[in-house]
């Protein structure tokens, strides 16, 4: 069970829930992030335009993403809207909820290894990790990418650090990302092809990471495609910039011309 630090959502929040009941005038939604709390979607907030039959749009058991319009904590009333949520907000909330559920199970496994309850885990480390990393799953993911050291500045016991890192490595398999771009180079020297090859070879040595791969292929004069395969976009972008800047600097030093640019993967 997840214990929210806030008993009620706030006006403007995007929440996720399950439809528990549908009446002619509206639908009642169990809020998954706030156990024991229900919100109501009035028929006028289901969709834009006139709604003849609300059951054509909302069904019992349906998972919905809604925007909080009003909250009356004294009465326990929470008014929601479906029509005021964008498609992008829906996708983001569903993804956030899936990540949260997975992270919560990981935290529970870590707690079990220490003979603690999930509630104790949240109180001792869960909320702290959320505050530091933005969301719990991001904390576990960062541990896998950067190591247990990312927890060093936090007031977390060594036993918690060890077990959190252990569970993170057991649970998360990182998927590599690709960063692509193009280098354009020209050389006016008699041995211009040799100079361009030298610039590209030198550029490859600018990659400082063992877990990042760089591929450079010929497209057609004067273009060369650069593909950086990395565990995350941050290191991928960093290596792409280092490699391309090194290639351009080298060819210019040899009397040629060079430039580079990012290219979105189709």
Curated annotation (Swiss-Prot):
InterPro entries referenced in this protein's UniProt entry, alphabetically: NA-bd_OB-fold, S1_domain, S1_IF2_alpha, TIF2_asu_arc, TIF2_asu_C, TIF2_asu_middle_sf, TIF_2_asu
Source organism of this protein record: Methanocaldococcus jannaschii (strain ATCC 43067 / DSM 2661 / JAL-1 / JCM 10045 / NBRC 100440) (Methanococcus jannaschii)
GO biological process, one term: translational initiation
Protein name: Translation initiation factor 2 subunit alpha
UniProt record similarity statement: Belongs to the eIF-2-alpha family.
Domain S1 motif, chain residue ranges per copy: 12-83
Protein function: eIF-2 functions in the early steps of protein synthesis by forming a ternary complex with GTP and initiator tRNA.
TM stretches of this protein: none
Taxonomic superkingdom: Archaea
Keyword Disulfide bond part of the UniProt annotation: no
Pfam families hit by this protein: EIF_2_alpha, S1
Presence of the UniProt keyword Protein biosynthesis in the record: yes
Keywords for this protein: Initiation factor, Protein biosynthesis, RNA-binding
Assembly mode: Heterotrimer composed of an alpha, a beta and a gamma chain.
GO molecular function terms listed in the Swiss-Prot or TrEMBL record: ribosome binding; RNA binding; translation initiation factor activity
